[in-house]
Amino acid sequence: MNDSLLSNGHAPPLRQATVDRQTKETKVHVELTLDGNGLADNHTGIPFLNHMLDQLCAHGLVDLRVQASGDTHIDDHHTNEDVGITLGMALDQALGDRRGIQRFGHFVAPLDESLVEVALDFSGRPHLNYGLQIPTQRVGTYDTQLVREFFVALVNHSRMTLHIRQLDGMNSHHIIEATFKAFARALRMAIALDPRRAQQIPSSKGVIQA
């Protein structure tokens, strides 16, 4: 059986979403295609965040376009958080009722001396267990506290449970990049369509909600 086909022999609908979000602090536009090829066009005004989003595309095989502007003359906090919010909203919309997905994902990614484990569940119940110990306050101009803020925003608006655990690492850039790579691969597993499940909701309750 072709894994890309439903039980009725038809291809599944394209899973994608476009979300625009604007506040007095930021303006964010996100286009997301889950069944993509890793295409990335990310311009957030925060170079390091662009780099991490590119990793998400390359290793999660999602297509992602993010255009963001904000009050980065103050600091990166609002833009970083609002990109996470808008991406989470797009992910939630693209997944719909979660029908037919694997739902769970888990991956351990090494990057030189760093090793990060990520497990996630599209449970409908937002929860983040964040276990990174990043040794420096900044990577270039990027405030490393914003890594957690990005994932908090993403988790809350995609309605996922996410565990991030640092198993090893000393270099801040390596730790963060390993995190995004592990997240990307876990995401790729979780959003994959399960041909054995066809169009069923992946829950014994028959519904996934908060």
Swiss-Prot record:
Q: What is its EC number?
A: 4.2.1.19
Record keywords:
Amino-acid biosynthesis, Cytoplasm, Histidine biosynthesis, Lyase
User: Which domain of life, per UniProt?
Assistant: Bacteria
Q: Which intervals of the chain are annotated as region Disordered?
A: 1-23
Pathway recorded for this protein: Amino-acid biosynthesis; L-histidine biosynthesis; L-histidine from 5-phospho-alpha-D-ribose 1-diphosphate: step 6/9
Please list the GO terms describing molecular function.
imidazoleglycerol-phosphate dehydratase activity
**Descriptive protein name:** Imidazoleglycerol-phosphate dehydratase
- Classification of source organism: Bacteria, Bacillati, Cyanobacteriota, Cyanophyceae, Acaryochloridales
